From Swiss-Prot:
The gene is hisC. Belongs to the class-II pyridoxal-phosphate-dependent aminotransferase family. Histidinol-phosphate aminotransferase subfamily. Keywords: Amino-acid biosynthesis, Aminotransferase, Histidine biosynthesis, Pyridoxal phosphate, Transferase. This is Histidinol-phosphate aminotransferase. One of its GO terms (biological process) is L-histidine biosynthetic process. Its EC number is 2.6.1.9. GO terms for molecular function: histidinol-phosphate transaminase activity; pyridoxal phosphate binding. It comes from Halalkalibacterium halodurans (strain ATCC BAA-125 / DSM 18197 / FERM 7344 / JCM 9153 / C-125). The modification N6-(pyridoxal phosphate)lysine is found at residue 222. It catalyses: L-histidinol phosphate + 2-oxoglutarate = 3-(imidazol-4-yl)-2-oxopropyl phosphate + L-glutamate. Homodimer. It comes from the Bacteria. Its cofactor is pyridoxal 5'-phosphate. Pathway: Amino-acid biosynthesis; L-histidine biosynthesis; L-histidine from 5-phospho-alpha-D-ribose 1-diphosphate: step 7/9.
Length: 369
């Protein structure tokens, strides 16, 4: 058997250990996970009710076109139903775009570091990667423009960016979009858009009317609290959606994910409460960092990337022993930084107290700048 050469040696995705495994291995009664940017307040109670009702229909294939959800999302974002494509998480929409546009003769442009799935899917399709380093944690749009050529097919803008939490302003994004060739796809990945508070964040969805090469990605995994159900979507002009729709696998969104997403959209109060609590938690973390003299990237998301000035792996392991799962920055391109998801006030209090203890200890590691 001959596998694609670019897949040989490609490491599989390695999820973090389940909390139950961590409890057992370290002898802990409780473990708090603040590593994957999930909603610490869960999902709307209406979601559980919708799933309970859907249990009566497990023998029937889901609606392959997600009609009810499609209409609900179309109203939510202000587009026509035909301007949407749904995926098993926005990860799958990324995969669909890469399958549709990339091959061995093409290249794709992205920031470095940014969300890992752009790179992974491009490698699988055999495309050349053109990674442009961030400037002060923010996309270098001018640098990205410079590396676009006749073989470029997709440019990725993670906005706000993961792992830094920083964002590209409306003025900068629109100027960038106007300069990208019309035959190059621009993907604005907005997984954290509901958390954004910046007044000058771009309103990208209306831009699909002007820019036929723009795709906007959104997800239900973050503020809506549906990470376990895997549902996301892309927004683009109808002609583009029609071109990529054949690449989408059939029945890729389960009945449960569809009814859950509809229910989540209907509970605006839950979303608003989650956003308000996140804002309070973000203020709690940033004020703590300032008191501790720790640098961080100003974030428009539900996580904060913090400079701890030492091996992030060591800090991660020390925090794990105290019952807190955070994210080491080593795999994210920041070996002396850690990423912490904003939790509830109680979770934040405990995590910050544990982190203060860890940073006060003499870690037998080489300090990194």
């Amino acid at each position: 058997m001959k596998i694609k050469p670019q897949i040989i040696g490609l490491p599989p995705y390695k999820p973090g250990k389940p909390m139950e495994d961590v409890k057992r291995e370290l002898g802990l009664e409780t473990v708090v996970k603040l590593a994957s940017n999930e909603n610490p307040f869960g999902a709307s109670p209406k979601v559980a009710e919708a799933i309970q009702e859907a249990l009566h229909h497990t023998a029937i294939y889901p609606d392959g076109y997600a009609r009810t959800l499609r209409d609900k999302v179309a109203h939510y974002v202000g587009v026509a139903p035909e301007e949407l494509i749904f995926g098993n998480g926005s990860d799958e929409v990324i995969q669909i775009l890469c399958r549709a546009f990339l091959n061995e003769q093409t290249n794709t442009v992205m920031a470095e570091p940014t969300f890992s799935q752009y790179k992974l899917n491009a490698v699988i399709e055999g495309a050349e990667l053109r990674e442009v380093p961030l400037k002060d944690g923010v996309h270098d749009l001018d640098g990205m423009l410079e590396v676009i050529d006749e073989n470029t097919r997709i440019v990725w803008v993670c906005n706000p960016n993961n792992p830094t939490g920083t964002y590209v302003s409306a003025e900068a994004f629109q100027s960038f979009l106007a300069k990208v060739p019309e035959d190059v796809l621009v993907v604005s990945d907005e997984a954290y858009v509901e958390y954004v508070t910046a007044d000058d964040y771009p309103d990208t969805v209306p831009m699909i009317r002007t820019y036929k090469n723009l795709v906007v990605l959104r997800t239900f995994s973050k503020v809506f609290g549906l990470a376990a159900l895997r549902i996301g979507y892309g927004v683009a002009n109808q002609a583009l959606i029609e071109k990529i729709e054949p690449v989408r696998p059939p029945f890729n969104n389960s009945t449960f994910s569809q009814v859950a997403a509809v229910a989540a959209l209907e509970d605006e109060a839950f979303v608003q409460s989650s956003v308000e609590k996140n804002n309070e938690g973000m203020e709690q973390l940033t004020e703590w960092c300032s008191r501790m003299g720790l640098d961080y990237f100003p974030s428009q998301t539900n996580f904060l990337l913090i400079h701890v000035n030492r091996s992030s792996d060591d800090v991660f392991n020390a925090m794990l022993k105290k019952g807190y799962i955070i994210r080491s920055g080593r795999a994210l391109g920041y070996p002396a930084w850690i990423r912490i998801t904003i939790g509830s006030k109680e979770q934040n209090d405990g995590c910050l107290a544990a982190l203060a203890d860890v940073l006060a200890e003499e870690l037998t590691t080489q300090h990194l700048s």
